[in-house]
Amino acid sequence: MNYFFESMKLRMVTWWQIPVICYCRPQIIHLDDEYCTLRIPLNWRTRNHVRSMYIGVFTVGADLTGGLLTLTTIHKRKRKVVLIFKDFHANFFKRAEEDVIFICRDGAAIDQAVQ
């Protein structure tokens, strides 16, 4: 499935409400009830002086994958819930010197929490 329109919708919403996410230009690769995958390109916007990705961009990607899964679940259940993150945990395995793929596979746990 092509997620071009979902990526464009994400850019439109974030441009207005959360501009820093829009600035990073995330692209949705896969989004369903179980997991979310997105890519953030390494370019002049996201690259630091040592030609690797800023840690803040890593945080945006990690936060956004879980957030998209949660928003999808909330929307599907037609719940009126405001999404506020208390904290999150992410593992960064090495320095990013190219585009980065972010994956969240916690769809079942998120579904359980939204109930």
Located regions from the model:
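Alpha-helical membrane-targeting segments
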Residues: M1-Y23, R45, H49
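Short, charged, low-hydrophobicity "junction" segments
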Residues: M8-W15, R39-R45, I74-F85
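Hydrophobic alpha-helical segments of small multi-pass membrane proteins
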Residues: M12, G56-V60, L64, D87-N91, ...
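A short, acidic/glycine-rich surface segment
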Residues: Y23, D111-Q115
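Catalytic strand-loop segment that frames the active site of acyl-thioester-processing enzymes
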Residues: Y23-M53
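Hot-dog-fold acyl-thioester-processing enzymes
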Residues: W44-G67, R79
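Hydrophobic beta-strand-centered segment that forms part of the acyl-chain substrate-binding groove
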Residues: L69-D111
